[in-house]
Amino acid sequence: MTELQPIAVLGGGSFGTALANLLAENGQRVLQWMRDPEQAGQMRRSGENPRYLKGVKLHPGIEPTSDLGAALQQAELVFVALPSSALRDALQPVAAQLSGKMLVSTTKGIEARTFKLMSEILEEIAPDARIGVLSGPNLAKEVADHALTATVIASEDEELCLRVQQALHGRTFRVYASADRFGVELGGALKNVYAIMSGMAAALGMGENTKSMLITRALAEMTRFAVKLGANPMTFLGLAGVGDLIVTCSSPKSRNYQVGFALGEGLSLDEAVQRLGEVAEGVNTLKVLKARAEELEVYMPLVAGLHAVLFEGRTLAQVIELLMRGEPKTDVDFIPTAGF
């Protein structure tokens, strides 16, 4: 009997672990790689990932490992769940082993130095690989707890999309397909910025009207920026756009929301990130997004306002007051506008 070909999941964080568990529950053999041998050993011994996904029992079909080469050698389908700041350095040394494989990025971030999305970095490292992006309203703890969830696999490669759907689709996890890889990935990266602002608003006791305004204007702002870069605006009306934005801006389980909430409680940015204990991609994305928006002359007042709060000494209340003074323009459109 032929042994089942394993699927590799790169990353020992909360989402990588939830994804590995889901794959294993669907009958897949999973090699989950993490840089820290001690973490891999602890997960093998305890059957849990107490640092990033406490209280969730791991399926025995998961094989934690710190040997990246061995994990890649056996797998054809590879899910990449690494922080944006670490992805290039982690994978560049094993570029030859990535050639021809199906590489699916789950990281919702932007590389600060280059403003490249993770799938673009994967293409640079492994030009012959088949690239996809997995994104949507997918809080790791809820995926692990089998809450009803849907996601999007985006790629121009239809065979890759089908392979991912077959591997992940199950009783509580539904996988839709999209050909707009750029739009799906950009939506996942951009929404993290607005989740920080929503968390701050919640901590400061702002009303539901205010929260709703922030989310809907964030969607308009994200779409405006994405269209400027060539994305399909309709993508932002789906799971990877408004769906991901809503859950990230509304749930205390969201890492970026948690950072924003801590800031609203009076913690410094360093203290808020330290309390989280994990990477909050929105902080890094905010810095490069503001600069890129100015370079492209895209009107993004919420991004500029949050940057003023985090890095220029303004308060959220001051920024919102300035935004409310601005001249209102159109509500819903898919072309650049000059109004908040």
From Swiss-Prot:
Reactions listed under catalytic activity: sn-glycerol 3-phosphate + NAD(+) = dihydroxyacetone phosphate + NADH + H(+); sn-glycerol 3-phosphate + NADP(+) = dihydroxyacetone phosphate + NADPH + H(+)
Similarity annotation: Belongs to the NAD-dependent glycerol-3-phosphate dehydrogenase family.
Residues annotated to bind NADPH: 14-15, 35, 108, 140, 255, 279, 281
MF annotations from Gene Ontology: glycerol-3-phosphate dehydrogenase [NAD(P)+] activity; NAD binding
Organism: Ectopseudomonas mendocina (strain ymp)
Record-level GO BP terms: carbohydrate metabolic process; glycerol-3-phosphate biosynthetic process; glycerol-3-phosphate catabolic process; glycerophospholipid biosynthetic process
Positions of sn-glycerol 3-phosphate binding: 108, 136, 191, 244, 254-256
The protein, known as: Glycerol-3-phosphate dehydrogenase [NAD(P)+]
A Pfam family the protein falls into: NAD_Gly3P_dh_C
